[in-house]
């Protein structure tokens, strides 16, 4: 309904008609491959303005086998290959010069734990590359996970909702 769409826009800053959702595949082992294939196809066909691809497989391996283990790093290498395929799809779609890539995660880990209070558990990667982004820049400011959303909002020149506590990481921009 129109009212539901308006609520969604206020809550998420986008119209429900502009959102395509792909659910995880039934076969967990095939899921990252299926997700990559769907993302590549979608990017080539639709040339989207914004795409979020969430590969949570390294998280599952970290909790099952342990973080900082050969199995965990093997899964990261696998996901790296999928990221390469997505980047190639962006290039083939002719939108590479207009694209910004952000690669991050929601938490670090020790052993098989989930987050925590140590730096190894709280630190996450934040890799950003693309249009109007400084090349080879190392972020000097401290950064929290909620700063990612604020940075994405800044990329799209959106007014940040007053209740957000995140701040855009402006030093990454040219």
Positions of the model-derived regions?
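Catalytic metal-binding/acid-base residues of hydrolase active sites
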Residues: 56-58, 89, 107-108, 132-133
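Metal-dependent active-site segment of extracytoplasmic phospho-/sulfohydrolases and closely related
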Residues: 75-118, 152
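Soluble non-cytosolic domains of exported or imported proteins
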Residues: 29-34, 70-80, 139-146, 163
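Active-site His/acidic residue clusters
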Residues: 9-22, 37-81, 85
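Substrate-binding rim/cap in mid-to-C-terminal beta-strand-loop elements of soluble/periplasmic
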Residues: 117-159, 170
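Binuclear metal-dependent hydrolase catalytic cores centered on His/Asp/Glu-rich metal-binding motifs
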Residues: 19-33
């Amino acid at each position: 309904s129109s009212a539901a769409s308006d609520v969604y826009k206020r809550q998420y800053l986008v119209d429900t008609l502009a959102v395509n959702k792909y659910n995880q595949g039934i076969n967990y082992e095939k899921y990252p491959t299926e997700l990559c294939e769907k993302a590549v196809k979608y990017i080539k066909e639709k040339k989207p303005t914004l795409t979020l691809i969430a590969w949570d497989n390294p998280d599952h391996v970290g909790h099952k086998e342990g973080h900082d283990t050969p199995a965990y790093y093997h899964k990261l290498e696998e996901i790296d290959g999928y990221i390469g395929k997505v980047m190639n799809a962006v290039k083939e779609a002719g939108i590479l010069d207009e694209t910004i890539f952000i690669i991050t995660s929601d938490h670090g880990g020790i052993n098989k734990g989930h987050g925590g209070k140590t730096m190894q558990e709280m630190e996450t990667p934040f890799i950003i590359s693309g249009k109007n982004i400084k090349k080879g820049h190392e972020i000097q400011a401290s950064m929290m996970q909620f700063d990612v959303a604020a940075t994405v909002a800044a990329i799209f020149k959106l007014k940040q909702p007053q209740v957000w506590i995140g701040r855009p990481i402006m030093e990454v921009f040219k």
